[in-house]
């Protein structure tokens, strides 16, 4: 099975009900205009710079954790700083891979459905999201991002996929393609194929 990033929408959904809603939402999907694409790219660049600072600047990471986490002391005692650094290092790498994919494939950001890609990075970027997490939830997210996602190589595309984007012309083409991916995608099977256990 290919590594196409759009399968991430199934991962994010993580249930058949949400998966069906994603498929239904394609009916309202529209093309992104140039300004919208630029805004998404700028947001990814902002996240990339943030993630880099978090694992290279100890003071910046400490400040963010103090401000973003509900119980800073408990988080540090239970989880520790090193795990956060590892995740932020990986997220810096993932956002760079995503930026490369966009640069190499002009149609990589094609429709408004693609804005969902930003949601992949929000659990370690958004203060409101991080503040609401319990220590257990944060530890679970660190395990997911630090251990289970890296083997999936989320933004590596096959030659077939590169060819698809190169020849992508219409929203109908895009919707049919993504709908087919979502309908066929089995999260548990995919994770097993990649050697990722207990996803």
UniProtKB/Swiss-Prot annotation:
Gene3D superfamilies, A to Z:
CAG pathogenicity island protein 13, CagS
A Pfam family of the record is CagS
InterPro entries documented for this protein: CagS, CagS_sf
Its name, as the record gives it, is CAG pathogenicity island protein 13
Native organism: Helicobacter pylori (strain J99 / ATCC 700824)
Tell me the name of the encoding gene: cagS
